[in-house]
Each structure stands twice: as structure tokens, then as C-alpha cells.
């Protein structure tokens, strides 16, 4: 009888312990990708080991499905506690009232240690809707050895890029990539516009009911792209243009740090292990004129907390661990090739992990020039028109002036 009572007491204690656990539901599209699932899981497991009263329940969909899924769940009044976001997803979810204000959850010291352009990009009407879990904005990946073998230097201006393309073409090598030029994801192509000194949909012009699109600089940019197209110098218009860089079909790629692990895995003979650091570097973006600084639009992977979550404080502790801990930096963020969001943590890694021309390139040639992404409620509709106009320049013979004129008219219609 006494043994039975002891067993009953033990079972009650175990049940009570299980019931007292804080459940945090985490939707991570990176957890759904084969290349990154294990690193995400390692951080989740470590957090649960350190916090035995917390259980993280994982969910994942493909990258392309995640935004719509989260929007649908939020509109129905049900979502996960923590969600991994990308692109303009924080803006869309925040304007729908689905995200908690991180200003009320995160320590000021932690936020001050992040890139401010990153935080401003995910701020809507004073509300901080998400924080970076990886500084993932794009850099100008360059195969300097490929350039050197062809007697060429790293380009400084777009004229340099064109002149290099002319020489590369002689050896059946493409002069540039434009692999993101499809769909309506404007953020993926703004690097080109910004570094031709064209700033579509910028907040200052929009406040004056101007699009920021039809400018003299845009005509120069589109004329340049048409000239490159006539040369047949582009490695890709859509699809995954990363492959062209990995197999030396093109000397440049605009991409995040994700090219580091993906390049290693895709072409290990050339880029496996530390060999990638001997082949590739991250250089400054080409600019319109010598002496100009590049302009890098923020594209971060971010974490947000659902406004309806019952465990916001506990969720924030997990978010900070996932984004800003030494363990996450070593076991997850390192595996993505990205830079850790807290700048103090990045500085600690300068003499080891980041002591190469890729990470240093991001830190010195790209991230000092980060600028806020100008999201708005018509981002996707406007983005589709702008991207379609760039496609028309590259893929058709329609006069550049006519492309600009009709696109400007369409933008005026949907924006104002």
C-alpha cells in the first residue's frame, strides 16, 4: 500500500511538473530547410536544457508559404508565440496588428547594440515589430581570382562592370547576375537602383506624392542594363543565380552570407571548407561615380512575437538567446554565414571566425552603409511594376523612355 502511494505521489509530481512548463511555439522557416534545420534545433535544445521549465514547440513551412500562413493565422486570432520573418513580412504583420512591440520587451542596452537601420526597418509608427536574428543584408560577392585570370580588377563603378563584361565575354564568362529579377519582392533588387542613385518609394518623395522612380539617374541605369543585355552579359534573370558564382560562370553575386555554406556544399571541389576564403570575398558595391559610398538596403532575417501571445516575456528571453547569445552565434548563425546582430558580439569574433575577406567584407564594405527599407502598404503591388519594368529593359526591345513612362503612370495610380 505504501509503495502504491509513493508511486502515485511520484506520478502526480511528474504530471504537475509537465503542466507547469511554459510552452513557446516557434515557427521557423529555416528549421524547415535541410541545410539549416540541425543548427536551429541545436539552439532550441540548448535553450530548453538551460531552462528546463520551458518547452519550445517547433513549426515550419517553406519560405514562400510562411508569410501567407502567418497572415492567415493572425487574422484568425491564432498564431505562434515566436515567428521567424524575412523581407517585408514584419511590416505586413505589424500593420495588421499581429506583432508585439519589442520596445516593451527588449532591454535598451540590447537594442542599442544592434544596427539601427535594421531596427528602423522593422519599426512601424514607433512600434518595434521584430529584431534581427541574423544580419543578412546583401554584399557584393566577388571572385577576385576569376577577375585576375582575365586581367581585370574589382570594379568601382558601373562603367567598370560593363568594361569588365566586355572582356569576360571573350572567354564565355558572364559579366553580371540579376537572379532576383522576378516576382514582386522589390527588396531583392533595390541594391541595383540604390547604387545607381535611384530611390523608388522613398519616404521623403512619397510624402510629396512623388514615386522617386522617374529620374535622370533611372534613365541612365536602364540604358546601362539595356547595353548589358545587348552584350548578353547577364548570367540569370530569375531562378537561383547563385549557381553561376559557385561554378565560376560569373565573377559577382549580390547575396547574403548564406552563400558561404551554400557555396561550400554546392561546389566543394572549389569552395569546400576554407577554400572558399581563397576564392571569394565581399567587396564594395559598384556605384554611379567614383568617390560615392554604396547604399545597402536592409534585408535581415528577424524574429517577432505574436501580439496575442500569453508568454511574451518568456518568448523574449528565447528570442534574445536565439539572436544574441554566444551559443547561437557559434552553433546557428555561424552555419548560415551571416553576421550576429549584436555588434559587441561580432567584434569578439573578428580575430577568429570573422578573420577572412568574406565576413570582414560584410562588416567593412557593406554594413556601414545600411539604409532603411522603405516599406509601405502597396509594397508588393508597386514592386511588381518596378521589377516588370526592369525585366522589360533586359528582355525586350521596348524603348527605355516608354518603359519608364508607363511604369511611372502605373505607380502614380496605385500609390496616390
What are these regions (language model features)?
Residues 93-98, 117-154, 179-206, 297-306, ...:
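Periplasmic solute-binding protein
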Residues 24-41, 373-378:
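Extracytoplasmic "Venus flytrap"
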Residues 62, 87-139, 162, 187-192, ...:
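Hinge/lid segment of periplasmic solute-binding proteins
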Residues 42-114, 121, 145-156, 244, ...:
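Extracytoplasmic "Venus flytrap"/periplasmic binding protein-like
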Residues 280-284, 333-392:
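Long, aromatic- and glycine/proline-rich binding clefts that accommodate carbohydrate-like moieties
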Residues 21-32, 54-59, 81-82, 129, ...:
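Short, well-ordered beta-strand elements
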Residues 39, 319-342:
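Periplasmic-binding protein-like
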Residues 165-168, 207-236, 281, 285:
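Glycine-centered hinge/linker elements that transmit conformational signals in sensory
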